Amino acid sequence: MPVDQEYIYSLLRKYKDRTATEAEKEELVSWYRQRAERDSVFPEDEHVVAESMRVRLHHEITRPQHDRRRQWLAAASILLIIGVSVGLYLRPTAGVDPGDITPGSHQAMLVLVDGTKISLTEAANGNIASQENIQITKSGDGQLIYTLAPNRQGTATASGYNTIETPKGGQYQVVLPDGSKIWLNAYSSLRLPLNFSEGAERRVELKGEAYFEVSHQPTRPFTVVSGQHAVQVLGTHFNVKAYADEPDIKTSLLEGKVRVTAGTHSVTLAPGQQSRLAEGNITVAEIDTREAVAWKEGYFMFDDERLEDIMRSVARWYDVEVVFDNDALKEETFGAVTTRFTRISTLLEIMEQTGDVQFRVEGKTIHISSKQPV
């Protein structure tokens, strides 16, 4: 029996608005599972496997070409809202080798104030360094924890900075002595002061991208510095993207309030807003914050973004080089939602299906060209 496209989309809209009844949710899941079973791709879990369902939605529901990508992205966003665990049941297209390139993982290097380098990838769990009044511990889940040493609470003897660096294909989380948490994205570095005792300035320096959950301390502002760009907060959740190869610096606010300063320019952000520093000017726009922090949640999430911008993020995470056979392809726009923890072929397949480009993987290089007419 042919699927009623409008009815399926009505169910998706209800999912997105959180108004779907349990019966309607079950109906949508049943619709998906029937098609998955037909192709012998049948998840065992009662909850729909997010990426498999996303691909099925994209293939099964046909809409006019001009709005197909946006509707597909909306459907994928719904699955993110539901919070379904990610599993992949995808069949790569002929142009993409499924055995090509694996995703990034928890990798980082800790550079101590004296220049000593400690590979957090290779170091055993437990205490890995002690400095003045600071103990540094590696946990078993990609997390580095700074704590004030016992009986040294409130002392301010430590000085200098440590640096945590993630390579391409790496990410790491840091917990500071004040309880603040920082997630560091691929190819980024974070410079941290050793002195986090009471009265000391809470100031870190970022190159690359990081998500911050800052502990609220009214008398001690927390400042994130990226070159001439600074974000000052008291306690809030926000994301800063400040890669050297990007044309701008973006600060996205999820909770609380932050003040963004660059030179003589300054703006205050409210939740749901993003500042953009480009060519010395700061602009502010309303955004879907899920896109800004999707990387931290384990997803790629792009909404009508330029292909060149998308591939910068892809290259950092998979540690690959990207070559455009035609510079005009850099301006192509795409929507894509997929897990970051799968081979690169999954993302490339999605983009091939939704656009007019094709990808060729040669070693650690991705070649992008125009799709050949059938």
Task: Name each region found by the language model.
Residues 23, 39-41, 80, 154, ...:
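Amphipathic alpha-helical interaction segments
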Residues 19-20:
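Charged, low-complexity interaction regions
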Residues 12-16:
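Regular secondary-structure segments
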